Amino acid sequence: VTADAPAGRDARDVARRLDEVADALRSHNIEAIVVGDGEEARAIVLGLIPEGAEVHSGKSKTLEDTGLYTELVESGRYEALRPRMAAMDRATQGREIRKLSAAPDFMLGSVAAITADGTLV
């Protein structure tokens, strides 16, 4: 969750609300980290994924906008599964595709929305 907001009182209100939503997520056993912007989020996520890890990602505007998807696919530091699976023949390699997508080391994606009570939409 990023805290991009106008300065002043509005920024404090946004920060307070983000902290409340993060607490609600935690109450559902979902780890939540509030960050200042997409670059900070990108750095944190990349810091959590060790080099060489298998990483699968869903289609995500957030991953694209933060540069995470490009980093995962093009840096050579990770084994990006999405492009690998896209290049496979579903008719002859369907079982292997399912196995790869079922248990990657890391799965990244995004949600459409998060409600104030910590529900993912």
Model regions and ranges:
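The feature marks the mature, well-folded catalytic cores of soluble enzymes
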Residues: 1-121
